[in-house]
Amino acid sequence: MTWAGDVEEQDDYFSCSDVSTSGDRRKRAPQTVTQEEVDQATSKIANEGQLSIRDILASQDTAVRITNPRDYQMELFLRAKMQNTIAVLDTGTGKTHIATLLLRHVLEEELENRAKGCAHKMAFFLVDSVNLVFQQANVLRCGLDQGVEGISGAMGQSLFQKQTWDKLFAVNMVIVCTAQVLVDCMMHSFMSISRMNLLIFDEAHHAKSNHPYARVMKDYYAHELDTSKRPRIFAMTASPVDVKGQSAEHVREAARELETLLHSRIATTSDSALARNSITRPEEEVAVYTRLRNEFETPLHQKVKAKYGDVAPFRKLFITAKLHASELGRWASDMYWSFAFADEQSRKLQIREELKYNRSKRDWSAAELDAQMARLKEATAFVQQYEIGAPTLSEQDLSSKVMKLQYWLNLYYERTTLARCIVFVEKRHTAQLLKLIFDHIGGPNLHCDVLVGINNRAGEENVSLRSQILTLQKFRRGELNCLFATSVAEEGLDIPQCNLVVRFDLYRTMIGYVQSRGRARHRNSKYLHMLEAENKEHTERLMNARHDENIMREFCKDLTHDRQLGDVEQEKAELIALEDKLFPSYTDEKSGAKLTYRSSLSILSHFVATYPSPDHNTMAQPTYVVNPKISDDPRDPQRNGFVCEVILPEHCPIISMVGQVYSRKTIAKCSAAFKMCIELRRKDHLNEFLLPTISKYLPAMRNALLAVSEKKKGNYAMVIKPTFWKQDRDTVPESLHLTIIDADRGLDRPHQPLAMLTRRPFPQLPSFPIYLTDCRPSNIVSQSLHIPISLTPELLEMFTRFTLRIFEDIYNKVYDYDVSKMSYWMLPVIEHRVASVRSMSNPQEVLDMDQIRKVYNEPFWKWSPQSRTDDLIDRYFVDPMNGGRRYYSDRLAPHLKPQDPVPANVPRQNHKFMKNILDFSDSKWMKSRDITRWHQDQPVLQVEKIPFRRNHLANVEDKEKKELANLETYICPEPLHISNLATPFVVMCYVLPAIIHRFESYLIALDACDVLDLKVSPALALEALTKDSDNSEEHGEEKINFKSGMGPNYERLEFLGDCFLKVATSLSVFVQQPEENEFEFHVRRMLMLCNQNLMETAVGKKKLYKYVRTDAFSRRNWYPEGLKLLRGKGLKKTEEDWLNVTHNLGDKSVADVCEAFIGAAFMQHHKGGQWTPNDWDEAVKAVKLFANSDDHLMEKWTDYYAAYTKPKYQTAGATATQLDLAHKIEMKHPYRFRYPRLLRSAFIHPSQPFMWENIPSYQRLEFLGDSLLDMAFIMHLFYKYPDKDPQWLTEHKTPMVSNKFLGAVCVKLGWHTHMKQNTAILSSQIRDYVYEVEEAEREANGAVDYWVSVSEPPKCLADVIEAFVAAIFVDSEFDFNVVQKFFDLHLKPFFLDMTLDAYENFASNHPTTRLSRLLSINFGCSEWRMGALETETLIPGKGKAIAAMVMIHDKVHFHSLGQSGRYARVRASHAALEKLEGLPPYEFRSKYGCDCVDEGEGEAGVDEAAVSKKVELMREAIGPSI
């Protein structure tokens, strides 16, 4: 994966035949696997015994990983299109990739021909063994999007029925089969040469004598006299002939005979081309074992011979047993007898069956067979009575040859099971015996089995074939890691993990040597020749094989120039011969640097090598594709020539350039390179010295995202009062608008709703919670009435006096009476009338006018002896001398008198006078105190002291809990005022400060909306403006200075807005810049997305910082502005003092608020359900506002499509191939394309030359589709999990948008087969991944997270999904419904349950963990670490870089350079893994000087705690990013 979704531009400055004959080559009997088994698909290996052969093979992993692109493959493909070709290439060089390219080309031509009404033709891929039928069929299915079927004799009698073949030809366009199957098919005229369009021969060196390959050519191909009806021939082999010590002339003659037979010409590549493409062979080593003992008879052998030596058919068994005694040891010879008689018995049974059907056979009689069967049973019983025991690792039981093999295998399997080994033997019994031996002596990490040819025992053909296939499958999966194999494994079996091949029995031919060596496919692999000491025959066999291989290489090297591909030396010679005056050149005006045709190749290579790559495996060289074309060169009399397209890696700023037509390929390549360099210079990717400008250009663009930091803070003004209160102020209102406010779940005491009267209609604000003493939430609900209350001067005065009395009695604030300065009025309402208030013609009827008049006329009263005691209950008591002493009276306390001591439970804090209850009730200062003036017989009341708590928007804080725990106290009434405010109304007024604070926050948020001209609800607007901690933007981190009670902060909306901003800017550059590529898209989008750009809008133009809410509720700032304070706290402060508030805001916070507002605009108008363009108009408007760029001028969604101009490639007529693709895609996803060429573009990889179809690659679409899919994923998470924070959302978005998931979806849909690409690495990587992920899905039994555990897929698979989404979006005229439908059908089912462990932990994986375990566990090394430092580079045109290093025993072995330490370390880990994985522990110790002593061996001895500690130590050693 791009690690956990991270992508960073990377600086990769350094990168980091005939076969031996044996029993396996017997003539094979017809197979009896049924048609039903072949056709039916079954699930998983739990029932392997019942799986069909085809289904088993369909899950095999047969790819070889190729680490570089190969230009010779393209040249060979282009040649094979033009003429019949025999490709002579070494094993592991990607011959099958060339065949796939050729098949794709031929099938596209076939589709066009069929569309024209031509007769249907088939392509045949011929192989030499049943195994290879299914293997190659699976390979082709991954690379072709037409039907491919593998056929072998396993289909039995149905192959002799015309209906079978007609059905196969109807549903497939490619048949993979053994040559004998094709011969039989053609013999019965089910197929003819004229009905074929392509014949491919795999391992073509078999085409000789009477081999089926030869019969196809001699009996059928040659007999088609009309050459125009013959199919194209493409043959592949590592060696066209087996040299066998013959002279070079004989080899040339044999090669000519092969060419004649196949009607083809040999083409090969030079060693320099292989070296240039990093084709490496395994390291070869010779293991010499001491001379074997002469053949001898063991004691058991002697006993068997004494008893049964007279039986003539047993004689060969005695000979074989003596041979095993010599080659394998005593134990193997004795063990041989245990199954030798069983084998013989099976053979006799077969003969008896044959006698039943063949009475003319006279060699045997039934009586003779019966007699021999009796002796066989007797001998079997005789052997079984002996206890052979287990072999010991000693010369007594084992031969020196087996002991040497054990030594080498132990080197690889001493610690882990990771190695994969194939041991080649000559005889079937040798493989079986070695398997039995190593079951005992191989150790806990060696898991072995045998791989032998299909035998011919009666009734067992199917089982034997099935067993062979399952064994290979287990070997690929790692359940087996060592195979003892006969020559059946020599040809064609691709096992990428195989890193050790042992020739236990030496090859007998050069082809056997070359083919078996080719099985070692791992990059760190070894090929081991086992030779007997002083055995001249062995030495000569080794020398002859190498000599014959050299003869063959010399033969290839001596081929004429037109048969050799990619000869670098020849190209250099041609370039030197060029004369600059004949071709254009460029001289830079500033520096005088000169670019010529010749130098352009090296300039371009240097540019690519130094260009940052996000993918370590991406090809790091230009690819040149040369096509024949009519020449414009006047010097070419034949007017035939070549045109070249140069293709750069997909991360480069320009991908493709087509040169001019020239008569020579080399000049055509120079032309393309020259034009590319000119374009790079024009766009400033090359500087005046023709060096990359990357160190100046890319960092500036990339750092746009990092241009601001939260650590950089500014001191900004903060608005604390909304403009709403200022409307019509300084006037006396003639009417007021009423808003009723209530708490839906009550308060701590019974309460009365209140009415707020305002000069203008109050906006309808959302409900919000306040928190009661017991932490229960109760929602404040308001309803605004639009019918005003008409006022008289008397009524207005009454309302004003009442409101000011609230401030005086409850909050101890005395304001000057000034109606014109009032912001609002607070009045009680009659609760039972609230429900019908909207139906009232006069809203004044809801007001509690009795209470209002009572308070107006008599704000309070005092106790006197004449007062009734009933009037003292449930009253609000105010201490006129102390603003902190307010009480609710609960009941009389008749058991107490004023002179009694203050009860012990009454809190003493801040009370100086505690002599008695009366003394406690008087709070006058000492000088004015005289408690004797109070009546000494007045009653004592039990009251509830009203706490100082004001911030009801937050839960009760710890410091408040102590006060709230003990509110009961006792007072005498006479020293206090008894307010005429009703107690329930007072209870409501005590939460008024929190209500006013939140109301004002909403109103300020609406002010911000007015400034921005955005229609957003108060709730969302306030959420977008709320920053409740110093580090709100650091999701998942512990909050610093967190302020409770502020409501939801901007984090979630910012997360949503960031996503929509990406969609909108991606879409705008997509439609406005039709000629630019993905690189330029990224730059333009980055400049709009960057925080610095958002800052300029928010700070410079709209001053959005004023409206950001960074402070929680303040006891000082909620009071109304404008009124003159006469008494109370803050008297000395002017209004300007407390209104001029500032706050510190980080630059990133301001930018985040911008994105949050985009998210708010999106959420406000996105209705859900069926999408309409209007849903997103307001969000688009917000993006235009904040992006503030000419690259985004759209104000509503429909503006995007209005700005889109369909490119010519989209509207051009579709070919039959493109229509066929659209039809196939529609079968998987229900959408019919209006423009099939647009769909085709979504499947074209950047490596595919543009000139082949004149359709651009998917890069532009992938750029857009990435953001569209992001939107779909985030909408799903955002609305399904409304309470999850951005950290959780980000972590759970990570698996959704990962390449790993989208790659798995691509395979599940089968769309990997439709991708058109021209890079060998992708063919093998896709094949590897397809087999692995399909196997994981089968094993998962329906679990949707099966894809998490598989390897990282090629990024192109995920790109295809993103490009397809963009394609349907564009084709549908920018209708997001089609994106949503794709998400709902194919993606959403994977994420219905986000609590799966695989998803919860997805984002926490890291490559360094793999490296840590590899070094600590597999190799047992404790002296290693990672480090990073800043360093200068030696590359021209480069500045400083970060070097990340992997040190082993104080020596740096692996490193990576980049402009980010974080990513450089990841790449350094990848580089180390690439070199270390597959090495056996002994070789690691040898290469890297490791002498660490580890406690215990093997996986059982691993201390996981120690390993985990090592991981932590490693991460600690890495340190922070530089």
Swiss-Prot record:
<feature type="binding site">
    <location>
        <begin position="89"/>
        <end position="96"/>
    </location>
    <ligand>
        <name>ATP</name>
    </ligand>
</feature>
<feature type="domain" description="RNase III 2">
    <location>
        <begin position="1222"/>
        <end position="1373"/>
    </location>
</feature>
<keyword id="KW-0479">Metal-binding</keyword>
<feature type="binding site">
    <location>
        <position position="1421"/>
    </location>
    <ligand>
        <name>Zn(2+)</name>
    </ligand>
</feature>
<feature type="short sequence motif" description="DEAH box">
    <location>
        <begin position="202"/>
        <end position="205"/>
    </location>
</feature>
<feature type="binding site">
    <location>
        <position position="1449"/>
    </location>
    <ligand>
        <name>Zn(2+)</name>
    </ligand>
</feature>
<dbReference type="GO" id="GO:0005634">
    <property type="term" value="C:nucleus"/>
</dbReference>
<keyword id="KW-0347">Helicase</keyword>
<dbReference type="Pfam" id="PF00271">
    <property type="entry name" value="Helicase_C"/>
</dbReference>
<feature type="domain" description="RNase III 1">
    <location>
        <begin position="995"/>
        <end position="1166"/>
    </location>
</feature>
<keyword id="KW-0677">Repeat</keyword>
<dbReference type="GO" id="GO:0005524">
    <property type="term" value="F:ATP binding"/>
</dbReference>
<dbReference type="GO" id="GO:0004525">
    <property type="term" value="F:ribonuclease III activity"/>
</dbReference>
<keyword id="KW-0694">RNA-binding</keyword>
<feature type="domain" description="Helicase C-terminal">
    <location>
        <begin position="408"/>
        <end position="576"/>
    </location>
</feature>
<dbReference type="InterPro" id="IPR027417">
    <property type="entry name" value="P-loop_NTPase"/>
</dbReference>
<keyword id="KW-0378">Hydrolase</keyword>
<dbReference type="InterPro" id="IPR038248">
    <property type="entry name" value="Dicer_dimer_sf"/>
</dbReference>
<keyword id="KW-0051">Antiviral defense</keyword>
<keyword id="KW-0862">Zinc</keyword>
<dbReference type="InterPro" id="IPR005034">
    <property type="entry name" value="Dicer_dimerisation_dom"/>
</dbReference>
<feature type="region of interest" description="Disordered">
    <location>
        <begin position="1"/>
        <end position="37"/>
    </location>
</feature>
<dbReference type="Pfam" id="PF24995">
    <property type="entry name" value="DSRM_2"/>
</dbReference>
<feature type="domain" description="PAZ">
    <location>
        <begin position="859"/>
        <end position="980"/>
    </location>
</feature>
<feature type="compositionally biased region" description="Acidic residues">
    <location>
        <begin position="1"/>
        <end position="12"/>
    </location>
</feature>
<dbReference type="Pfam" id="PF04851">
    <property type="entry name" value="ResIII"/>
</dbReference>
<feature type="site" description="Important for activity">
    <location>
        <position position="1355"/>
    </location>
</feature>
<dbReference type="Pfam" id="PF03368">
    <property type="entry name" value="Dicer_dimer"/>
</dbReference>
<dbReference type="InterPro" id="IPR056755">
    <property type="entry name" value="DSRM_2"/>
</dbReference>
<protein>
    <recommendedName>
        <fullName>Dicer-like protein 1</fullName>
        <ecNumber>3.1.26.-</ecNumber>
        <ecNumber>3.6.4.-</ecNumber>
    </recommendedName>
</protein>
<comment type="similarity">
    <text>Belongs to the helicase family. Dicer subfamily.</text>
</comment>
<feature type="domain" description="Dicer dsRNA-binding fold">
    <location>
        <begin position="600"/>
        <end position="700"/>
    </location>
</feature>
<dbReference type="GO" id="GO:0004386">
    <property type="term" value="F:helicase activity"/>
</dbReference>
<dbReference type="Pfam" id="PF00636">
    <property type="entry name" value="Ribonuclease_3"/>
</dbReference>
<feature type="binding site">
    <location>
        <position position="1362"/>
    </location>
    <ligand>
        <name>Mg(2+)</name>
    </ligand>
</feature>
<dbReference type="GO" id="GO:0050688">
    <property type="term" value="P:regulation of defense response to virus"/>
</dbReference>
<feature type="domain" description="Helicase ATP-binding">
    <location>
        <begin position="76"/>
        <end position="258"/>
    </location>
</feature>
<dbReference type="InterPro" id="IPR003100">
    <property type="entry name" value="PAZ_dom"/>
</dbReference>
<keyword id="KW-0930">Antiviral protein</keyword>
<keyword id="KW-0464">Manganese</keyword>
<dbReference type="InterPro" id="IPR014001">
    <property type="entry name" value="Helicase_ATP-bd"/>
</dbReference>
<feature type="binding site">
    <location>
        <position position="1359"/>
    </location>
    <ligand>
        <name>Mg(2+)</name>
    </ligand>
</feature>
